[in-house]
């Protein structure tokens, strides 16, 4: 319980997009991104290096690559708009950069949902020393 309280307090200090990303993951994948993907494999969480360990970790790798292509705004703080139409997330708004960030998050949330069967607890808190292989290009 104390851990959940700490996570809630930390989440309140996070701005814009990372909160939206968490909400999008919860809506699409029906699980908490913060609890499930903040420290998973070599790419889920802050930074990322080495090779993705499984399909779930690859979702984070692709998400990192997608954020890396965003140039006109900060993907970690840019707030975007989206709606749900016929059960699908649709990114909206007039700002192309924010829409691009939304698309990165939307695709990642769908990837997490589609790869729930690959999720393996052995990759939670995965040691960075196991992520030393040469990374593949985005």
Swiss-Prot record:
Give the UniProt tissue specificity note.
Expressed by the venom gland.
What GO cellular-component annotations does this UniProt entry give?
extracellular region
UniProt-listed Gene3D superfamilies: Phospholipase A2 domain (1.20.90.10)
Is-annotated flag, keyword Cell inner membrane?
no
Which SMART domains does the annotation name? PA2c
Enzyme Commission code(s) on record: 3.1.1.4
Required co-factor? Ca(2+)
One short Pfam name that applies is Phospholip_A2_1
* Disulphide linkage map: 42-131, 44-60, 59-111, 65-138, 66-104, 73-97, 91-102
The protein in question is named Acidic phospholipase A2 Cvv-E6e
High-level lineage: Eukaryota, Metazoa, Chordata, Craniata, Vertebrata
